[in-house]
Amino acid sequence: MKNITKAFETIDQYFSPKIITEINDQYVKIAKIKGNDIPWHNHENEDELFFIIEGNLLMELENEPMFTMQKNDLFVVKKV
């Protein structure tokens, strides 16, 4: 069993994802994000799931309107 609050306490750098478990050959990672620290990128082989624990995140997707995710929001970015 994993405690996400305790796992976050071990992260001391922003946008430095940490693997907390694995399921069906996929990693479950957590990260602290501040400001615009996420570099633009895409995933060709896997989807990416975002779940907001605290705060909010401005989500920008190619050819889509921007939107803001807030606490307890979940969103999946499909692979390209």
Predicted features along the sequence, with ranges:
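A short, N-terminal "cap"/entry segment at the start of jelly-roll beta-barrel domains
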Residues: 1-31, 40
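Short, surface-exposed charged micro-motifs
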Residues: 19, 49, 58, 66, ...
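A cytosolic small-molecule/anion-sensing beta-strand core signal
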Residues: 24, 53-54, 70-71
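Structural motif
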Residues: 27, 37, 56-58, 74
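Short, conserved beta-strand element in jelly-roll/cupin
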Residues: 32-33, 43-59
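Short beta-turn/strand-loop junction motif enriched in small, turn-promoting residues
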Residues: 35-38, 80
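Short acidic-glycine-tyrosine-enriched beta hairpin
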Residues: 63-80
